[in-house]
């Protein structure tokens, strides 16, 4: 399995390259505008980027999905509630994408945005349960999502609470969380940590906004 986190220090954002070198396919989650790093990584790993996944429509930066799709011919996937104007494949909660031995499962986590989706990662070589979840803007290291970018702030806050407690915190305590933003990003609060990853168990115990 290929798993790489690509960080963007200027905006405090993170994107991900995921794939299976045995079958030569990969996907990029939440690509930044400058796409050369993904193309270089894919060439080095010997994989073709065939899929682009968006956790949600981003308010803090411009996505590189259009450029990356044009350069690779990859399909852009986003939750149906996003209703973007660009060409895309719309999915619902529970949708899965197979990349050889790797499965990416959509976990609809509305709140920050109505279409917001986390992606659970399953590697059949490691087991049947997710070993990690890409939480996007729903759960950060030491913080949680902002509700003020939702259609309605109060409904957004309720949605975030439900998504955290009914979709994410029910995962195994050992499940790794890899967020869409790191410390310093405007999408989080003062509690957001500079660490690039955490676990469900650690956040459940130490994240003050989950207590």
Where are these regions (language model features)?
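Hydrophobic residues at beta-strand termini and immediately following loops
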Residues: 6, 91, 200
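Active-site metal-binding motif and surrounding structural segment of the metallo-beta-lactamase
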Residues: 33-77
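Short amphipathic alpha-helical segments
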Residues: 40-42, 64-67, 89-90, 147, ...
